[in-house]
Structures are given as structure tokens and as C-alpha cells.
Amino acid sequence: MKRIRMMGAAVALALPLIGGPAFLAVPANAVTCLPGTATPTDSYPGTVVMANNFESGTLAGFAVQTGGTGTATVSTAQHRDGACSAYLHVTSDSGSIANFSTALPSGTKQVYADGWFKITVAGLSGNDVPYFRFFSGSTRFVDVYRYNSNGQLWLRVLTPGGTFAYTRLTASSVSLNAWHRIAMHVTPKGSATTVQVWFDGTQVYSSSQVNTVATSVTRVQNGSEHPQQMGDEYIDDLIIKNLTS
């Protein structure tokens, strides 16, 4: 364990996110997607909350937050299958933010998050490009990301004392300009929280004794909630599932 400091044509449907600046984006041109593409599925347990290949051409169903030069759109520039994917673009400019979130039903005890990610532009050294971030209310308590300084995959946990605990998940760099699958299982129970992480189909982390500040989970976020988290990231075949026991 280690501590470190941390468009092709596009269309977006932006929904207000409580607690942050949000702007409604009105598309000038609709992208050409393939709405007949099969809805993504996986073998993880739970009830499907979100299963999206972004072939609708919109981010409908997500809470979208953008600010400054940040954009959250659907793009035809990159796609794992079909013709479209979600695209988050954030710069180093002041106030640049882009993310979208999946709200979880009341009573959620466990959540599985699964998706494909392609980072084409990394951010500034010392910062990161997020994959999945898990929130309890407004508090982010678990996330995984690609660390810009060396490209490694890291897990970050907010402890009850208010400090972050970091775990390196891969020794090698996560390659840019390539699709990678990230899946996570999170069951928030304070000092007995379960966190599991899979990278490209291989489990790289599993513990039922993770010490977190959270005892509930209310949403899963893609992208960063704070500004200047520079990076270009495409997301496809996103699946979020919940369990109530």
C-alpha cells in the first residue's frame, strides 16, 4: 500500500446533478449511431440499473455535469461495437469538468459496475483519469483510475479518518488508445467493506475488509467531479447492477 498525491459530431443530453454546476447542452447535430445494436449484458449478479451502448445517440438516463471547456457527449469517433460511445473531454483550463452518473435505487446494498474504456489523451503528471467512482451521498469513497505519471491502475479508498489509502493494482502501464474492460463490485460496510476489481477479465483485487467511511452507496460516476482533471476518455457497453441484500 502506498500513498501518492494525487469531436467528431457529438450530442449530449445533460441533466442537473445535485451539488455541482450543470449546464444543459443542446445538440447542434445528431450523431449517426446504430440503435439496433444489442444491449450489453454480463454475468455479474444483480438487477440491471443501467445497460447502455450509447447507440441511442444521447446520454439520457444519466445525471450529466459539465463546466468550462469540459464536454460529456456521444461520439462516433471511437466505439467498441456499434457506431457510438460516450465521450468525456476535460482540459487543464480552470473550471473544466465532465462526468455522468448512474443513480442507484434506494436500499442498494451492493453494486456491480462493468464497462469498456479507451483513454486517448492522458492528463497532467501527478493527476489521474478516472474509470469508476462510487459515492455515498456527496462523498466519494472508492474509485479506480489510471495514474498519469506511470499509467498504472490504482484503487483509492476514503478511510473513516478522512485520509485516502492507495493500492496499486497493476505494475505495468494501462495502454492508451486501446479498449480495456474494468469491472468492480462494492459492498459498503464501513471497516468491513467489500471491494473487488477486474481488469480485462482478470481479478486484480479482492478484499472484504476494506476500511471505508461509507455504509451506503447511492451512485456510480464516470469522469471526475472536480475541475482540471484533464483527459479524453471513451466509454462503451456500460452496465450497472445492484443488489438489495
Place the predicted regions along the sequence by residue.
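Secretory targeting and sorting signals
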Residues: 1-30
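Extracellular carbohydrate-recognition regions
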Residues: 31-66
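Extracellular glycan-recognition surfaces and repeat-rich motifs
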Residues: 55-94
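Secreted extracellular polysaccharide-interacting domains
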Residues: 85-112, 163-169
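Glycan-recognition/cleft segments
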Residues: 129-157
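Short, aromatic/His-centered strand-loop micro-motif at the edge of beta-sheets
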Residues: 159-181
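Short tryptophan-centered beta-strand motifs in secreted/extracellular beta-sheet-rich domains
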Residues: 177-188, 197
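Flexible glycan-contacting loops in extracellular carbohydrate-active proteins
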Residues: 207-237
